[in-house]
Amino acid sequence: MSELENAHQGPLEGSATVSTNSNSYNEKSGNSTAPGTAGYNDNLAQAKPVSSYISHEGPPKDELEELQKEVDKQLEKKSKSDLLFVSVCCLMVAFGGFVFGWDTGTISGFVRQTDFIRRFGSTRANGTTYLSDVRTGLMVSIFNIGCAIGGIVLSKLGDMYGRKIGLMTVVVIYSIGIIIQIASIDKWYQYFIGRIISGLGVGGITVLAPMLISEVSPKQLRGTLVSCYQLMITFGIFLGYCTNFGTKNYSNSVQWRVPLGLCFAWSIFMIVGMTFVPESPRYLVEVGKIEEAKRSLARANKTTEDSPLVTLEMENYQSSIEAERLAGSASWGELVTGKPQMFRRTLMGMMIQSLQQLTGDNYFFYYGTTIFQAVGLEDSFETAIVLGVVNFVSTFFSLYTVDRFGRRNCLLWGCVGMICCYVVYASVGVTRLWPNGQDQPSSKGAGNCMIVFACFYIFCFATTWAPVAYVLISESYPLRVRGKAMSIASACNWIWGFLISFFTPFITSAINFYYGYVFMGCMVFAYFYVFFFVPETKGLTLEEVNEMYEENVLPWKSTKWIPPSRRTTDYDLDATRNDPRPFYKRMFTKEK
């Protein structure tokens, strides 16, 4: 037992004086030093006894074990109706994904609409207007830069004022950006500025929404409820496509101002709905609002404040947060030097979020109408709706696959599926789409084949990488550094989103459907990376994930790892930490 653990005497009382440092996150640090905190060892040696912060001792270990048994029995007796309230609350938080998806779905159509091109495009010598590749790329992609900045900067509002208030604030910022876009008359840079500001808001949403869902939801439903965020994104994309289809025949600004006006309406709806959502109990415990935390837990789990479930969860929160307080506040440097294995975990989050973009999803979602116009379709808006339907329906399957098959299996099999789809899609586009040259009509059969495999690709993406990337990063970090780590990971997602969105018009002009081979190569790399570096987090609490990293479990054996609190006497920990097999056999053969 570490000095830090010995120092802990029990949970905080509601009357305890508690720091409101916005960077205080939970980490079971064992015997390790908390890097980035000056003089940690001296501070620990001279630390006041925890009894100076609290007024009663926590339950003995045997009482906690009995409490855990009572909680397990309580969970077994819970019906689906008992989880209805927390599910509805998480859906309301996940509605932030709908706001993001709506923007993605509508902008893909705006760049093909006549009034939008007339107002914000350039004029040729013959008087016709057009959107250049540069201007199109900037107006589409700058949103992602705003998101990257918002994810890092505005996500701190969740640490300072709570996840709930922080989320409502970033939605207001998003609304301001939408108002600026609607008010644009004929200056493309005004619309451009509005896109940046709305991106700031969405960047904050993408960090705070999954964070709040994962901290409010019961662990047995956490993967499913966090996946609802991605479900809402796909629903927003689909309805955005439908709205563009409904307004495309107008000849004035109704084409694009009506979809933008609905963006504003959705943001107002979310702000109102958020008033009914409970605050994160983890955050409330951290800032010393113990009674509020109990009420939030009881409300979310549809039980009483003195129930075994609430008592056990509060003890877990208070013990780990008090231990973290003695270690000091986290610095940004701790994402690199922290323990257990914080650099590896930070890098893993950055890689997973980057690779999610490098699957090529935004190639289809941002430029779907443009792509299928090139395939030879007369009404590419209709095909965009088909893609939107496939995306939305497929995401329903993810609510099952994420918790049924686990995070690793979803990512690995998702890579395999998308690789196969890209091979066919790109090969047909390169060799069969224009049998008589690009200046001649395209082959209808080849075009239809490409659409079918684009739909297969979207199914593979929507059931695997789309939701799992968010679920995985929400489960991989201790509360102590969670906000910082998630914001860095999300920023990587947005930066790659910007690069892909901006350069896609230029790349497709140069190499056309060879572009599919680029994404295929990224998925081959992703398969190997996930296999060797991404551990399974299914069914684990945030504290148990920390313990897994402390014990140096091999990622490809992490599915066999059992937390210390659940182990039997015959459990072999070394079997999960060592693998004598040659490198190539680890991936392609089962261990005997």
Swiss-Prot record:
<dbReference type="GO" id="GO:0005886">
    <property type="term" value="C:plasma membrane"/>
</dbReference>
<feature type="topological domain" description="Extracellular">
    <location>
        <begin position="103"/>
        <end position="137"/>
    </location>
</feature>
<dbReference type="GO" id="GO:0005353">
    <property type="term" value="F:fructose transmembrane transporter activity"/>
</dbReference>
<keyword id="KW-0813">Transport</keyword>
<feature type="compositionally biased region" description="Basic and acidic residues">
    <location>
        <begin position="58"/>
        <end position="68"/>
    </location>
</feature>
<feature type="transmembrane region" description="Helical; Name=6">
    <location>
        <begin position="258"/>
        <end position="278"/>
    </location>
</feature>
<feature type="topological domain" description="Cytoplasmic">
    <location>
        <begin position="217"/>
        <end position="222"/>
    </location>
</feature>
<dbReference type="GO" id="GO:0071944">
    <property type="term" value="C:cell periphery"/>
</dbReference>
<feature type="glycosylation site" description="N-linked (GlcNAc...) asparagine">
    <location>
        <position position="249"/>
    </location>
</feature>
<feature type="region of interest" description="Disordered">
    <location>
        <begin position="49"/>
        <end position="68"/>
    </location>
</feature>
<feature type="topological domain" description="Cytoplasmic">
    <location>
        <begin position="474"/>
        <end position="490"/>
    </location>
</feature>
<feature type="topological domain" description="Extracellular">
    <location>
        <begin position="431"/>
        <end position="452"/>
    </location>
</feature>
<feature type="topological domain" description="Extracellular">
    <location>
        <position position="512"/>
    </location>
</feature>
<feature type="transmembrane region" description="Helical; Name=5">
    <location>
        <begin position="223"/>
        <end position="243"/>
    </location>
</feature>
<feature type="transmembrane region" description="Helical; Name=2">
    <location>
        <begin position="138"/>
        <end position="158"/>
    </location>
</feature>
<dbReference type="GO" id="GO:0055056">
    <property type="term" value="F:D-glucose transmembrane transporter activity"/>
</dbReference>
<dbReference type="GO" id="GO:0005351">
    <property type="term" value="F:carbohydrate:proton symporter activity"/>
</dbReference>
<keyword id="KW-0325">Glycoprotein</keyword>
<feature type="transmembrane region" description="Helical; Name=9">
    <location>
        <begin position="410"/>
        <end position="430"/>
    </location>
</feature>
<dbReference type="InterPro" id="IPR020846">
    <property type="entry name" value="MFS_dom"/>
</dbReference>
<comment type="function">
    <text>Probable glucose transporter.</text>
</comment>
<dbReference type="GO" id="GO:0008643">
    <property type="term" value="P:carbohydrate transport"/>
</dbReference>
<feature type="transmembrane region" description="Helical; Name=3">
    <location>
        <begin position="165"/>
        <end position="185"/>
    </location>
</feature>
<feature type="region of interest" description="Disordered">
    <location>
        <begin position="1"/>
        <end position="43"/>
    </location>
</feature>
<dbReference type="GO" id="GO:0015578">
    <property type="term" value="F:mannose transmembrane transporter activity"/>
</dbReference>
<feature type="transmembrane region" description="Helical; Name=4">
    <location>
        <begin position="196"/>
        <end position="216"/>
    </location>
</feature>
<feature type="transmembrane region" description="Helical; Name=8">
    <location>
        <begin position="385"/>
        <end position="402"/>
    </location>
</feature>
<keyword id="KW-1133">Transmembrane helix</keyword>
<feature type="topological domain" description="Cytoplasmic">
    <location>
        <begin position="1"/>
        <end position="81"/>
    </location>
</feature>
<dbReference type="InterPro" id="IPR005829">
    <property type="entry name" value="Sugar_transporter_CS"/>
</dbReference>
<dbReference type="GO" id="GO:1904659">
    <property type="term" value="P:D-glucose transmembrane transport"/>
</dbReference>
<protein>
    <recommendedName>
        <fullName>Probable glucose transporter HXT5</fullName>
    </recommendedName>
</protein>
<feature type="topological domain" description="Extracellular">
    <location>
        <begin position="186"/>
        <end position="195"/>
    </location>
</feature>
<keyword id="KW-1017">Isopeptide bond</keyword>
<feature type="transmembrane region" description="Helical; Name=1">
    <location>
        <begin position="82"/>
        <end position="102"/>
    </location>
</feature>
<feature type="glycosylation site" description="N-linked (GlcNAc...) asparagine">
    <location>
        <position position="126"/>
    </location>
</feature>
<keyword id="KW-0677">Repeat</keyword>
<feature type="transmembrane region" description="Helical; Name=10">
    <location>
        <begin position="453"/>
        <end position="473"/>
    </location>
</feature>
<feature type="compositionally biased region" description="Polar residues">
    <location>
        <begin position="16"/>
        <end position="35"/>
    </location>
</feature>
<dbReference type="InterPro" id="IPR005828">
    <property type="entry name" value="MFS_sugar_transport-like"/>
</dbReference>
<feature type="transmembrane region" description="Helical; Name=7">
    <location>
        <begin position="362"/>
        <end position="378"/>
    </location>
</feature>
<dbReference type="GO" id="GO:0008645">
    <property type="term" value="P:hexose transmembrane transport"/>
</dbReference>
